Swiss-Prot record:
Database matches in PROSITE patterns: TRYPSIN_DOM, TRYPSIN_HIS, TRYPSIN_SER
MF-aspect GO terms: serine-type endopeptidase activity
CDD domains named in the record: Tryp_SPc
Name under which the protein is recorded: Granzyme F
Major location category of this protein: other
Protein task: This enzyme is probably necessary for target cell lysis in cell-mediated immune responses.
Glycosylation sites: N106, N154, N223
This protein's GO CC annotations: cytolytic granule
Disulfide bonds: C50-C66, C143-C210, C175-C189
Pro-peptide region(s): 19-20
Species in which this protein is naturally found: Mus musculus (Mouse)
Gene3D superfamilies with a match to the protein in the record: Trypsin-like serine proteases (2.40.10.10)
Family: Belongs to the peptidase S1 family. Granzyme subfamily.
Lineage: Eukaryota, Metazoa, Chordata, Craniata, Vertebrata
Signal peptide stretch: 1-18
């Protein structure tokens, strides 16, 4: 790996909305019906937003660092700035971050949101399937990540419309070179350092979709350069997800 890449692989300070879609393309409206926009207010009074995805009629999965007060979820959106008839805006009844979440090393950065009311299934609103226990995607497999992020690093505004980029699953040893706090049992690393098409700021909590299933939850990426993003490995947390959805 070129030395300059090594110098630039500093972790972004984790803040709400810390990851975004760079490059990629706008998707066909409502073709990713599982996508959610999570909005909330931080302790400093500022409004923030993250990505997320519907996994059951009452539950959305997102990143644990995407939390605050006045939480609500927008489902069925394509143009997030427009008042679309397909949109369902539902307050969050309860936020359940993983109890082992550590904001210092970004492990267990996963959270369930229980909605106050049941999501109405339509062509624009559908849950995303989770993988089976012990399922895995091999390095080299092409997956996708979607969100309402900036279209370039220098852009000052995020995209109004949902965009998607294709990412390549990286080898664990390569991920360790980029991220010294990378834990292969709990995380997946995906991207392509050679292409301007990766994750950056604004869509933390969005899904890494492989074979039409959610294999990861976006947690963080690289600072000052485009490269792989790190995702919380959904398979590792399936027992916790299942247990909490049954209890609530």
């Amino acid at each position: 790996m070129p030395p300059i890449l090594i110098l630039l692989t500093l972790l972004l300070p984790l803040r709400a909305g810390a990851e975004e879609i760079i490059g990629g393309h706008e998707v066909k409206p409502h073709s990713r019906p599982y996508m959610a926009r999570v909005r909330f207010v931080k302790d400093n009074g500022k409004r923030h937003s993250c990505g997320g995805f519907l996994v059951q009629d009452y539950f959305v999965l997102t990143a644990a660092h995407c939390t605050g007060s006045s939480m609500r979820v927008i489902l069925g959106a394509h143009n997030i700035r427009a008042k679309e008839e397909t949109q369902q805006i539902i307050p969050v009844a309860k936020a359940i971050p993983h109890p082992a979440y550590d904001d210092k090393d970004n492990t267990s950065d996963i959270m369930l949101l229980k909605l106050e009311s049941k999501a109405k299934r339509t062509k624009a609103v559908r849950p995303l399937k989770l993988p089976r226990p012990n399922a895995r995607v091999k390095p080299g497999h092409v997956c996708s990540v979607a969100g309402w992020g900036r279209t370039s690093i220098n852009a000052t505004q995020r995209s109004s419309c949902l965009r998607e980029a294709q990412l390549i699953i990286q080898k664990d040893k390569e991920c360790k070179k980029y991220f010294y706090k990378y834990f292969k049992t709990m995380q997946i690393c995906a991207g392509d350092p050679k292409k301007i098409q990766s994750t950056y700021s604004g869509d933390s909590g969005g899904p890494l979709v492989c074979n039409n299933k959610a294999y990861g939850v976006l947690t963080y990426g690289l600072n000052r350069t485009i490269g792989p993003g790190v995702f919380t490995k959904v398979v590792h947390y399936l027992p916790w997800i299942s247990r909490n959805m049954k209890l609530l």
